[in-house]
Amino acid sequence: MSPERHLRWSLALAALFLAMGLWLEAMIGLRAAGWVDDPLRREFLRLGHAHGGVLALLNVGVAWALGQLETPSAWAGKIRRATLLGALLVGGGFVAGGLTHGPTDPGPPVLVVPAGALMVLGGVVATALVRPGDRVPGGSR
């Protein structure tokens, strides 16, 4: 994935979760039945909006840092994919878990949230630790 594509996808993800926050605020303000009168649904929609938005902005920072730190392209591509997919899994997992919840617990989609969080964490740690001359395990550069 190119640096430009990573930045564009990061900003698109931020716009998506920002729009979701505006929609959620409107639903709360209008007291829309079915959307926000259910406390568990409302909580998980808020979690998805907040986590997705923050992690999308984190991706903007990662996109910038990868260029500034001269991260090798083989590493940078893996990091870009991991952090973007991780942000989508965390935000989307919370939202989908809230929309498909049972009587007392979130729905099964929330199970992807920890995997997404680990992907983002791994990408940020790799961004911090990988140096310009480092090779990707397996010998590719």
Task: List the model feature ranges, each with a label.
Residues M1-R141:
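Polytopic transmembrane helical bundles with strong interfacial aromatic enrichment
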